[in-house]
Curated annotation (Swiss-Prot):
Single biological process term from Gene Ontology: translation
Source species: Mycoplasma pneumoniae (strain ATCC 29342 / M129 / Subtype 1) (Mycoplasmoides pneumoniae)
Function noted in UniProt: Binds 23S rRNA and is also seen to make contacts with the A and possibly P site tRNAs.
Pfam families referenced in this protein's UniProt entry, alphabetically: Ribosomal_L16
Name of the featured protein: Large ribosomal subunit protein uL16
InterPro entries (UniProt xref): Ribosomal_uL16 (IPR047873), Ribosomal_uL16_bact-type (IPR000114), Ribosomal_uL16_CS (IPR020798), Ribosomal_uL16_dom (IPR016180), Ribosomal_uL16_sf (IPR036920)
Origin organism lineage: Bacteria, Bacillati, Mycoplasmatota, Mycoplasmoidales, Mycoplasmoidaceae
Keyword Nucleus included in the entry's annotation: no
tRNA processing as UniProt keyword: no
Domain of life: Bacteria
Family: Belongs to the universal ribosomal protein uL16 family.
Length: 139
């Protein structure tokens, strides 16, 4: 699973996923991309399961790019612990995905297969999404 090698701070503040993406909003490498139409936090397990779903459809010639990375840790207090006494320990890693962020890109396979691969990956993610062609703009 994806996670940073090291971070400056163990417990970051919660970053908002509201609003539109400033960067990473167009298909840069592949021919088709999977774009978030609403924002959310996507954890490393969901990214990994989407990656596996795409790679099963790619074959030998297909190419995939993962455009998001889980940089932020999410904390959680243990079960049956009273409130207070500090913030909980880091439990998992999430990527902050805003509206319009390109999450995955694919290329070098037939168009129908690319759409099938991105659709399967999209069903693994906790965001609403659409498939974007390279020439189109995600607005």
């Amino acid at each position: 699973m994806l996670q940073p090698k090291r971070t400056k701070y163990r417990k970051p503040h919660n970053v908002s996923y509201e609003g539109k993406a400033k960067g990473n909003s167009y298909v840069a490498f592949g021919e088709y991309g999977l774009v978030a139409t609403k924002g959310n936090w996507i954890d490393a397990r969901a990214i990994e399961s989407a990656r596996i779903a795409i790679s099963k459809c790619l074959g030998k010639t297909g190419k995939m790019w993962i455009r998001i990375f889980p940089h932020m840790s999410k904390t959680k207090k243990p079960l049956e612990v009273r409130m207070g006494s500090g913030k909980g320990n880091p439990e998992f890693w999430v990527a902050v995905v805003k509206q319009g962020t390109v999450m995955f890109e694919v290329a070098n396979i037939p168009e129908s297969q690319m759409i099938k691969a991105l659709t399967r990956a999209g069903h693994k993610l906790p965001v609403t999404w659409k498939i974007l062609k390279r020439e189109e703009v995600s607005a």
